[in-house]
């Protein structure tokens, strides 16, 4: 599997593209549709799924145009955040501080994640683990063969996700990272929702929220 990234201008958010021999998965389609479209066309493979680490607006701004353009591949999301796709107050686009932008309202998802299930299809193999705390339905995707994890807004390089938002919980976030991410081998690459890549070992050693 090959992994590509584009960076969206709204919230400097990362969209990921996972390429198998035959298909493509898109993770968290953010604000820059033109860049997302160009990357998909460059890869040139059919999209078999769209995975959402969570449903804050910056991670879903191109979701519906992506679906409409590429024959409606199924969208996977945590059930606890499924309604946020079409509820601006919960995906945060409807908050007063975002009055300068349009509300983000998407169609419902087709699939809910099953935690700890091993997903295997179209050349992909991954496990979904809960990493709530930044938002109640935050998840991470573990790819054992590629020895990496996509963490959304749970774990970043030398920091963690915000916990001052609706449904955020600092203790839940720390617990999820320690029990579902830091249990991975130290050499695993971490692909976060914002910022540069890191590793499990680096975060254990240098993340100020976990340094001993």
Regions from the PLM with identified roles:
Residues 1, 45, 73-74, 124, ...:
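A structural micro-motif
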Residues 1-42, 140-152:
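Conserved beta-strand hairpin/beta-sheet module of binuclear metal-dependent hydrolase folds
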Residues 6, 18, 117-123:
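Short acidic-hydrophobic surface loop/beta-edge motif
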Residues 6-7, 108-110, 130-132:
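Short Gly/Pro-enriched turn/cap motifs at secondary-structure boundaries
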Residues 14-16, 111, 116-117, 139, ...:
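Residue-level detector of beta-strand structural context in well-folded domains
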Residues 27-28, 48-55, 75-78, 130-133, ...:
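Active-site neighborhood of phospho(di)ester-bond hydrolases with catalytic His/Asp-centered motifs
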Residues 32-35, 41-118, 205-209:
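Active-site HxH/HxHxD metal-binding segment of metal-dependent hydrolases
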Residues 91-94, 125-212:
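Metallo-beta-lactamase
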């Amino acid at each position: 599997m090959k992994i590509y990234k584009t960076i969206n201008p709204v919230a400097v958010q990362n969209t990921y593209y996972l390429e198998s021999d035959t298909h493509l998965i898109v993770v968290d389609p953010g604000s820059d549709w033109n860049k997302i479209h160009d990357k998909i066309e460059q890869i040139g493979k059919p999209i078999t799924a769209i995975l959402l680490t969570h449903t804050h607006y910056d991670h879903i701004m191109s979701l519906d145009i992506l679906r409409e353009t590429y024959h409606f591949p199924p969208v996977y999301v945590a059930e606890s955040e499924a309604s946020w796709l079409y509820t601006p107050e919960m995906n945060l686009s409807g908050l007063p501080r975002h009055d300068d932008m349009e509300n983000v309202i998407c169609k419902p998802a087709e699939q809910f994640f099953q935690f700890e299930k091993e997903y295997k299809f179209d050349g992909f193999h991954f496990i979904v683990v809960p990493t709530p705390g930044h938002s109640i339905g935050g998840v991470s995707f573990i790819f054992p063969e590629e020895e990496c994890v996509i963490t959304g807004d749970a774990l970043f390089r030398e920091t963690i996700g915000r916990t001052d938002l609706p449904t955020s919980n600092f203790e839940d976030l720390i617990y999820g990272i320690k029990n579902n991410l830091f249990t991975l081998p130290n050499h695993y690459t971490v692909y976060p929702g914002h910022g540069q890549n890191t590793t499990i070992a680096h975060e254990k050693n240098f993340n100020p929220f976990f340094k001993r």
